[in-house]
């Protein structure tokens, strides 16, 4: 199963694509979609929407996972991601920041460095993914991979 983790942001949208199979998780790719301060609000939203669509086409994920909209500061960006996933017919799953931290580190109150270090270790990466947004997106993908099973549907956006 391919999972696309997303860390929605207005200036930078982080992404992390992983493959989860038989309890093993491997990184396919990670990175960011960026906007610039010179862009108008509609231009930024269009770039984020188009970037998300491109990621969905490139990695063809089975599921898309990201931080719960309610907790996210920029719900407009998160809604663009949700719209692109919905248009592609993909199930979208959301997790609270505490759930992601608990799943990845074992501590729902872990700090950013603890999260990044565990993402690096769990995914057997040479170094902590940069920028931070990409590491956060990989964290969302890891959280979803850990949640797969009969109970995963409770996290699905309906």
Regions picked out by a protein language model, each given a short descriptive name:
Residues 1-158:
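Phosphate- and other anionic-substrate recognition elements at nucleic-acid/protein interfaces
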